[in-house]
């Protein structure tokens, strides 16, 4: 729907609620006399104005999404003409106004003034936290990094369960890491914030954050700073949204982040085995081939080393091996996860294996088809 059609729809709805207001407003004095001025019933008489404020905020939101900042601001100013609005609508109005200024570099100071001049006393904790998150975003864009970090920390202190605050704090640290690629603690902080936000979102917004986590893990150093940040996370894990990244997690089994990937794949195997079984089945064959090649190369290198060594040199091949921390190949991790899946869901694993075997048999080309393929 284009913005012109939405404008016509808004005008029609405002006309409808204007008629509702004309019918209800004469009843306000009667309600105040019967039940007192502080009665909750009194607010029902202004329900038409509340709906009008909601309409204005929604239209301003759509206008901002269309890149029409002037239309958004002019629409929001109409809220001040209403005699009565709810706290939630006042919050949405101020948030839309600040976001509209945020996307215009020459209006950043104006948007920051909107936030600083807002009286937060009447707002809930989550709304106050979102205001401080917006303040941190403006300060960060204005180049005041320390003040932005303090604003994000204040937002988290006000509401630990607001995913938007965690997301923006993670983006703040992520941006600093892009400017200073050697500062791994910034990337670790970003990963911690992203994982916390993904666990709180409970919707598809978590996927965009998890993509960023996987990208940051590829920038890990030799000490494993980033995967340790993942390992130290003890909050809720959105297993359903990690399903999308099963191929990436399986590939991580062959890197330093194998411990983190193994833990996630085990949780997926216990909760959603059908989404994982065929990936494991295919990866098992690939990783087994890699394991055989690696072991063969190690044996050839060991034989060459023993051949070049003096005859009287002591053989201490086992001295370099640490029995407490044996090296594990990706194939070992896949085998372990597959065994857990088969143990937890034996009938399901058997059924899916039968399906795979039937597919191989049914789609296997006949001898005539092989001859035709080879000769043409």
Task: Place the predicted regions along the sequence by residue.
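"A position-specific structural signal for the A-helix of alpha-solenoid helical repeats
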Residues: 58, 94-98, 133-134, 168, ...
């Amino acid at each position: 729907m284009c913005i012109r059609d939405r404008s016509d729809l808004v005008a029609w709805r405002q006309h409808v609620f204007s008629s509702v207001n004309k019918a209800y407003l004469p009843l306000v004095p009667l309600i105040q006399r019967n039940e007192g001025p502080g009665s909750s019933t009194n607010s029902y008489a202004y329900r038409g104005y509340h709906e009008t404020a909601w309409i204005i905020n929604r239209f301003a939101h759509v206008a901002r999404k269309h890149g029409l900042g002037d239309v958004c601001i002019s629409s929001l100013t109409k809220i001040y003409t209403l005699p009565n609005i709810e706290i939630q609508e006042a919050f949405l109005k101020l948030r839309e106004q600040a976001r509209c200024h945020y996307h215009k570099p020459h209006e950043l100071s104006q948007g920051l003034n909107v936030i600083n001049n807002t009286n937060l006393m009447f707002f809930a904790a989550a709304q106050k936290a979102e205001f401080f998150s917006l303040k941190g975003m403006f300060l960060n864009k204005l180049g005041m990094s320390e003040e932005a970090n303090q604003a994000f920390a204040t937002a988290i202190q006000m509401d630990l369960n607001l995913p938007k605050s965690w997301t923006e704090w993670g983006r703040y640290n992520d941006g600093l890491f892009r400017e200073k690629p050697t500062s791994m603690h910034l990337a670790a902080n970003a990963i911690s914030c992203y994982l916390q936000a993904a666990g709180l979102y409970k919707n598809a917004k978590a996927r965009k954050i998890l993509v960023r986590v996987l990208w940051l893990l590829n920038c890990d150093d030799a000490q494993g700073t980033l995967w340790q940040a993942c390992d130290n996370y003890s909050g809720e894990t959105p297993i359903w949204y990690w399903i999308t990244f099963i191929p990436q997690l399986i590939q991580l089994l062959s890197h330093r982040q194998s411990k983190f990937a193994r833990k996630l794949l085990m949780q997926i195997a216990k909760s959603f085995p059908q989404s994982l079984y065929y990936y494991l089945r295919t990866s098992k064959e690939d990783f087994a081939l890699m394991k055989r090649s690696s072991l063969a190369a190690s044996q050839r290198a060991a034989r060459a080393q023993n051949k070049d060594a003096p005859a009287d040199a002591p053989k201490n091949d086992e001295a370099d091996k640490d029995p407490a921390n044996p090296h594990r190949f990706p194939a070992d991790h896949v085998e372990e996860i597959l065994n857990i899946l088969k143990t937890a869901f034996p009938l399901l694993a058997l059924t899916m294996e039968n399906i795979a075997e039937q597919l191989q048999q049914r789609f296997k080309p006949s001898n005539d088809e092989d001859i035709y393929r080879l000769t043409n």
